[in-house]
């Protein structure tokens, strides 16, 4: 299992950053997600499911994303999701925004990637944390850059 937790400070309003996680905006911060459509939206968000399609090169994967946690207040925004990728990995990620000042937001991206069968466990050992760290850093930097574009 690989775990991560990355924190950065974004010089933008919390609402500006949070909008990047809307269904209509998600491709700005997740460019490999080519489709994200609601399947079952629950009141209060938790338990809602979405069909998401990810494409990198010629490889295309479609999977169901479930909202596990959700909070949306003036000072804190939080969403935790889970999905099974390629029948080999159970991935949980959480996105937390904390309002530091009017135009200063702390962004915490954390999660875990667990191999759920022999193939998944083997691939995680081969890929290691170095590749995962690059993916995490790239994502956090993309959120930062897109938030900066939106706030200017």
Per-range role (PLM):
Residues 1-45:
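Hydrophobic ligand-binding cavity/cleft-lining segments
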Residues 1-9, 100, 137, 141, ...:
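Hydrophobic-ligand-binding modules of eukaryotic lipid transfer/binding families
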Residues 3-5, 60-65, 89-94:
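Short, surface-exposed coil-to-beta transition loops
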Residues 7-9, 51-53, 68, 94-98, ...:
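Residue-level recognition of well-ordered beta-strand positions that form the cores
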Residues 14, 133-140:
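Short, amphipathic alpha-helical "lid/cap" segments that border enzyme active or binding sites
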Residues 80-134:
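Beta-strand/loop substructures that line and gate deep hydrophobic ligand-binding cavities in soluble
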Residues 13, 72-73, 100-104:
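Short strand-connecting beta-turns/loops that link adjacent beta-strands
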Residues 38-86, 138-152:
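Glycine-rich portal/gate segments that line the openings of hydrophobic small-molecule binding cavities
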């Amino acid at each position: 299992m690989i775990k991560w937790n990355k924190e950065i400070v974004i010089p933008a309003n919390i609402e500006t950053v949070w909008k990047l996680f809307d269904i209509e905006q998600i491709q700005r911060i997740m460019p490999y997600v080519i489709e994200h459509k609601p399947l079952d939206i629950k009141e209060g968000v938790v338990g809602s499911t979405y069909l998401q399609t990810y494409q990198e090169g010629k490889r295309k994967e479609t999977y169901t994303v479930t909202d596990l946690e959700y909070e949306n207040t003036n000072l804190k925004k939080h969403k935790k999701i889970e999905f099974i990728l390629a029948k080999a990995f159970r991935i949980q990620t959480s996105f937390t925004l904390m309002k530091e000042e009017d135009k200063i937001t702390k962004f915490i991206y954390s999660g875990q990637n667990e191999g759920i069968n022999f193939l998944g466990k083997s691939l995680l050992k081969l890929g290691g944390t170095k590749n995962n760290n690059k993916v995490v850093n790239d994502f956090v930097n993309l959120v930062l850059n897109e938030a900066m574009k939106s706030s200017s």
